[in-house]
Regions:
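Charged docking surfaces used in two-component/phosphorelay signaling
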Residues: 16-24
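Acidic, metal-coordinating helix/loop segments flanking the phosphotransfer/catalytic sites
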Residues: 31-51
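C-terminal output helix
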Residues: 109-118
Length: 123
C-alpha cells in the first residue's frame, strides 16, 4: 500500500506541482487548501497519513496553527511535518520548528529537494 502524504497550501498551483512530484515517486496524495480543511480531511481518513507538507500563510488556520493542533493529537504527535513556505527568515524557520515541524523548506524549491526531504522520513 502506498504511503500517504497530506499537502496543505492555499495555492492550487503549488498543490498540483507538489502532488505531481510525489505521485511520480509512488506516494498517494491528499490535498487541503488551508489548516481547517486539512483537519477535516484528516478526520475523514481512516488510515491517517504518513507525512504532512504544509505552507505557513493560509486563510482560516495557518500552518503554525495546523502544526500545533496536530502535535496535540496523539494520532499525529509523531507524524513528520515539512513546512514548505516562501517565508525564509530565521524567525519563521525557528518558530516553525519550535511549534513542532520536522523540517523547513523554502519556496521556490526543486522537486528533487522536496523528494529528498520526504525520503528522510519515509522509505
Amino acid at each position: 500500500m502506498p504511503q500517504t502524504i497530506l499537502v496543505v497550501d492555499d495555492s492550487p498551483t503549488i498543490i498540483k506541482f507538489v502532488s505531481f512530484s510525489l505521485k511520480n515517486k509512488g506516494f498517494q496524495v491528499v490535498s487541503a487548501c488551508d489548516g481547517m480543511d486539512a483537519i477535516e480531511k484528516l478526520s475523514n481518513l481512516s488510515e491517517g497519513v504518513d507525512l504532512v507538507i504544509t505552507d505557513l500563510n493560509m486563510p482560516n488556520l495557518d500552518g503554525y496553527g495546523l502544526i500545533d493542533t496536530l502535535r496535540q493529537n496523539e494520532s499525529f504527535a509523531n507524524t513528520p511535518i515539512i513546512i514548505l513556505s516562501s517565508e525564509d527568515g530565521d524567525d519563521d524557520r525557528q518558530r516553525g520548528l519550535d511549534v513542532g515541524a520536522s523540517s523547513y523548506l523554502v519556496k521556490p524549491f526543486k522537486p528533487q529537494k522536496l523528494i529528498s526531504e520526504v525520503s528522510k522520513y519515509l522509505n
